[in-house]
């Protein structure tokens, strides 16, 4: 079935996996029902790329920031540079930033850079896109401290943690993981989260849904997650669910697109 109003809350179309056919793919997405994509930077170099893509494709927007795996060469004036980039009309958020304790980037450095970007998001009154991998305790300690307008992307916590996130004013995005066999926690969260706080994402090119797991992901495949979550929530119309999550994206990112 052909769906419309597909809004991908979180992707990485600057990734090298798209180098062979990026323009061809991105030109085709609106024909597949995609109405919006927020492309997330991981450092200052990728920030320039995601802004350039947002300039080229009307349906695309950008988030700029430092990812916790990309902190080897952070310049002293990085906050000033990020702040300058946010003045671009297609930049809608700070991100992707957060904490990732799966890898070996020093935790004190991760926490400092994340906290500084949290403060910046408040100073600029902008949403912030949060990465939280195996770091729930420290991530939520900082979210409690600053209470930003945050999207916890690819949410991997429990229902209890989701409820705390909602109380803090956060939004949550889910994607292809909900189609995996071992996705019990994600399914429970999808079933319980207030519908007005739920966004859909791909994290493209990663996290492709079943039956494409392990292959390159793109925004048109978000429908597999949408179908699964609609089923879990007993929403009879997948299109209605896509309409709701697209409106949620517009609300979170302060967009006038629908």
What are these regions (language model features)?
Residues 1-258:
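Mid-domain alpha/beta scaffold segments of enzyme catalytic cores
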């Amino acid at each position: 079935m052909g769906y419309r109003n597909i809004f991908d809350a979180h992707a990485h179309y600057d990734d090298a996996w798209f180098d062979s056919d990026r323009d061809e793919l991105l030109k085709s997405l609106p024909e597949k029902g995609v109405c919006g994509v927020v492309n997330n930077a991981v450092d200052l170099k990728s920030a320039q790329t995601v802004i350039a893509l947002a300039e080229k494709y009307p349906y695309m927007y950008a988030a700029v920031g430092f990812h916790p795996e990309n902190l080897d060469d952070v310049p002293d004036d990085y906050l000033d540079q990020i702040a300058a980039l946010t003045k671009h009309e297609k930049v809608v958020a700070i991100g992707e930033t957060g904490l990732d304790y799966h890898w070996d980037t020093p935790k004190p450095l991760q926490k400092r850079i994340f906290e500084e970007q949290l403060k910046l998001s408040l100073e600029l009154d902008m949403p912030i896109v949060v990465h939280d991998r195996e770091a729930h305790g420290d991530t939520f300690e900082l979210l409690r401290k600053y209470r930003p307008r945050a999207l916890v992307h690819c949410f991997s916590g429990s229902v209890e943690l989701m409820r705390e996130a909602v109380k803090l004013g956060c939004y949550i995005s889910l994607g292809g993981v909900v189609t995996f066999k071992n996705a019990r926690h994600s399914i429970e969260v999808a079933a319980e989260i207030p519908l007005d706080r739920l966004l859909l994402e791909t994290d493209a090119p990663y996290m492709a849904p079943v039956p494409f797991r392990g292959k390159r992901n793109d925004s048109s495949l978000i429908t597999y997650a949408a179908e699964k979550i609609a089923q879990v929530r007993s929403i009879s119309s997948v299109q209605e669910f896509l309409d709701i999550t697209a409106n949620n994206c517009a609300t979170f990112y302060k967009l006038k697109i629908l």
